[in-house]
Regions:
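Substrate-recognition "cap/lid" segment bordering the active-site pocket of phosphatases
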Residues: 112-137
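N-terminal helical cap/lid subdomain that shapes the substrate entry/recognition surface
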Residues: 2-92, 99-100, 111-115
């Protein structure tokens, strides 16, 4: 009988809303595309999630890809608390599974700044889990 459930976070328990955040910050058209390619679509994004780079280091790497948008790239990091949105079902579902006796674990790729910015809000379901392993840990 299955008694343990292991969840990823992104696009399972939270919506990774980088497109909406970028639009909210006023990035449109070519600017949107250049900033996206310099950040979330850049291989350095995964290295940052792994915890191998500081925020300052990754911003510098991203800015190398789009130096004219360094200010905007910095602005993204001032809005890390808005880059994901908790799915409505995430909290109730994790509580229900826990009440039914399932042991819930999290295994996910997350950067430390995004984790810390969302811990009390969009990652509130973590209170229901038995353990977690994030890529930055």
């Amino acid at each position: 009988m299955i008694r343990t459930v292991i969840f990823d976070i992104g696009m399972v328990l939270v919506y990774f809303r980088w497109r909406e955040l970028y639009a909210q910050l006023g990035f449109e058209g070519e600017k949107f595309e250049r900033i996206a390619k310099a950040t979330v679509q850049n291989p350095w994004w995964n290295e940052f999630d792994k915890g191998l780079m500081t925020t300052e280091e990754v911003i510098e790497r991203f800015a190398e890809s789009a130096p004219e948008y360094k200010k905007e790239i910095v602005e993204i990091y001032n809005h890390m608390d808005e880059i994901v949105t908790l799915y409505d079902y995430a909290g109730p579902w994790s509580r229900e599974l826990k009440e039914k006796g399932y042991r819930i674990y999290i295994l996910s790729n997350w950067s430390k700044p995004a984790y810390e910015a969302n811990l009390e809000t969009n990652l509130c379901f973590l209170k229901e889990v038995y353990g977690e392993v994030m890529s930055f840990m």
